Amino acid sequence: LTGNLYHPGIRDLYGLQCWIATLIILGGIGFPILFNYGKLVNHKVRNLFYRLTGSSKRMPSHVRIVNTTTRIVITATLLLLVGGTLLFWLSENNNCLRGLPLRGKLAVSFFSAVTPRTAGFNTVDLTSLLPSTWFLTLLLMWIGASPLSTGGGIKTTTITIALKNIINTLRGKEKIEIFKRQLPSENVRRAHAIILLSILWIGTATCLVAFWVPEGSVTQILFEVTSAISTVGLSLDFTSQLNTAGKIIISLTMFVGRVGLITLLSGLIPRQSSQSYTYA
């Protein structure tokens, strides 16, 4: 459709937007999470059947099915959905949401909080958004979806672990605990490495595109690069202005975002065998 989901024929179909948003959320949660909850529902149904039939059999409880990763993903997803919806509504209430009915404002705000994290659809004119909303959309694109899902970004688990580590550092705590479970130090190092590499790549790609395509504003270029590395597809009407060099940089950024910087660099840089050191 011309204009994406902002097409005049469908942009007021709020029910359709909610259905699409639901599918986006399910795709962005990750297949292991969906499998875990499917398994949980299956076990609860079977336990109910066993109780009704008087059988002594019992399936494992949710404690062993819904693990720490699942809880992190669900909690982070809910916070991003609720927070993103409220912030979009507050930011655009007197701008692009003006004149819409209450259900329309809620549907558009909810959809606009969902789609930047993985899908790339839009039901509003992105170029008419306020700078605060651009920054919100950029942040949601950068965070992205969850591990082993259809979305990109640095992932919800990465940002959660990094934020928890910052909080613990400020409190003077050495161990990282989430939901009463201690996280391995390797996970913490990996989370910070992913964030740092992502910021470095976005900054470098933004500078290169700005050099080769000087007619673009910094906001447009940064938005385009972040959308590319998170494999989202949103743009502030800047993609058509890219020349050959700009297209190559954006294409390479999309490839890196899809494969993952850690994965890509791990394949290019040989692993060093562990060595033991003795300190005097």
Regions found by a protein language model. Give the residues of each.
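Membrane-proximal intracellular helices of multi-pass ion channels
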Residues: 1-280
